[in-house]
Curated annotation (Swiss-Prot):
It comes from Crocosphaera subtropica (strain ATCC 51142 / BH68). The lineage of its organism: Bacteria, Bacillati, Cyanobacteriota, Cyanophyceae, Oscillatoriophycideae. This is UPF0367 protein cce_2199. NCBIfam families: PRK13683.1 (NF010236). It comes from the Bacteria. HAMAP family: UPF0367. Belongs to the UPF0367 family.
Amino acid sequence: MISIDLALKYTPLPISVQRKEVEDAQTLYNQIVNAMKSGTSQLIELTCEKQTEKKVAVMSDQISAVILSQKDGGAAAGRVPGFFSMVESEQ
C-alpha cells in the first residue's frame, strides 16, 4: 500500500488515504500538488482503496503539505512516516 498524507493548516493530525499501485498514488500526489500550486481554492475529493467506505473532501488552499510514502506492514498503525511525537509521562 502507498499512503498519501495531507497536512492541513491549523490541524495537528494528517489526513491519509491509500492506493494499491504506485502509479495511482503518484497520479493522486501530482493532482494534489497541482491544486496547491493553482491560485484558486479547489475542492479535492479523496477516497481510500484500503478502506473503501472512507471519503474526505478538503479545500486545496488549506493543505500545507502532501506526503507520499510506502506503507510497511510492520509500521505502527496511525503513525505517519517522517512525523513523531514525544510524550512525557507524569508519575
